[in-house]
Regions:
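Residues that scaffold, gate, or flank divalent-cation-dependent active/transport sites
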Residues: 1-109, 113, 120-128, 137, ...
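DNA-contacting surface of Y-family translesion DNA polymerases
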Residues: 2-7, 65-66, 186, 190-282
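Short acidic, glycine/serine/threonine-rich loops at helix termini
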Residues: 19-21, 39-40, 149-155, 212, ...
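Amphipathic, charged-and-aliphatic alpha-helical interface segments
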Residues: 48, 166-202
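A structural signal for the main folded, soluble domain(s) of proteins
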Residues: 90, 162-169
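Glycine-rich, histidine-containing beta strand-loop boundary motifs that form or position
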Residues: 98, 111, 141-143, 201-204, ...
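Flexible hinge/switch segments at interdomain interfaces of large molecular machines
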Residues: 99-101, 165, 233-237
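Structured, non-catalytic alpha/beta "coupling" segments that mediate domain-domain communication
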Residues: 117-161, 217-218, 222
Length: 282
């Protein structure tokens, strides 16, 4: 058994939630602040240097052909809930990363001890499920959260599995910026000429401790593929919901009974997947 954690990465999450697509440069703008700020940017806008967090004025200076759209947080939250509901059919142990939202959704799923073939199959099912929702997803599979995240970043809307023991070799050529660095930490590493995870992992532990303290020691472990951090599950809702829309009025009770039975089976499977029992239905 190898892979136990799946990382799901959905680029342009907010744009997908609001139905904004296309190759033109565009941004979603948060107008709630005194100065309008970019909340998410399309690939074309990012290529011009536009990034989440910068002011709309600066974004327009970098990309004069930019098209701004207002950020609709209610739509983003609805899509987040739909995404979680879809992923909860695979496991009830899911952690969300908030630091990249709403530009990118990143979620970790604890699959438990899983053979590589089974993990790859689950990863493909996750990708297909989200794709049907209009959410192109990249899925990384590994034994640790950091390696799974790095694998998702390399999967290009596909599935990439890192086998047990291959973590360090996979991570070595990747940029050191994948580590959770503060701006000043990144500047120090750049001055030292440390560009890759492999280079960072090869630094003496004493030197890393002297420069970065406890967090540096954690980064060294992550860069080496040794990540023992557990998935911190998001609390699941206290209810499940399923429905069916009839094209025409129901004339026979048999039809209604069949539909209700099918919905009951669907709800039962969802509850079983999250180790819950129904207490009330309506």
């Amino acid at each position: 058994m190898s892979a136990s954690i799946a990382c799901v990465m959905i680029e342009d999450f907010a744009a997908a939630a609001q139905g904004i697509a296309g190759a033109l440069p565009s941004v979603l703008v948060d107008y709630r602040q005194r100065r309008a700020k970019v909340a998410a940017a399309s690939a074309a806008a990012r290529a011009a240097g536009v990034a989440p967090g910068m002011s709309l004025m600066r974004a327009r200076a970098l990309c004069p052909k930019l098209t701004p759209h207002p950020l609709k947080l209610d739509r983003v939250e609805q899509m987040r809930e739909r995404t979680l509901n879809a992923l909860w059919t695979f496991t009830n142990r899911i952690e969300q990363a908030e630091n990249r939202m709403p530009q990118t959704a990143v979620l970790w799923l604890d699959l438990g001890p899983t053979h590589d073939d089974d993990a790859a199959r689950i990863g493909a099912q996750i990708s297909t499920t989200l794709g049907r929702m209009g959410l192109p997803a990249s899925v990384g599979l590994a034994r640790g959260k950091f390696t799974a995240l790095a694998a998702a970043g390399q999967a290009a809307c596909g599935v990439q599995l890192i086998a047990r023991g291959a973590e360090a070799d996979f991570l070595a050529p990747l940029p050191v910026g994948l580590l959770p660095l503060e701006r000043e930490d990144a500047r120090k590493l750049d001055l030292l000429g440390v560009r890759t995870l492999g280079h960072f992992a090869a630094l003496p532990r004493s030197a890393i401790s002297a420069q970065f303290g406890r967090r540096g020691r954690l980064w060294r472990l992550l860069a080496s593929g040794r990540d023992t951090r557990r998935v911190k599950p998001t609390r699941m809702p206290d209810f499940e919901r399923a429905g069916f829309d009839f094209d025409d009025p129901v004339a026979e009770l048999v039809t209604l009974d069949n539909v209700l039975s099918a919905l009951a089976v669907t709800l039962s499977r969802r509850l079983e997947s999250r180790a819950s029992q129904p207490t009330k239905s309506r």
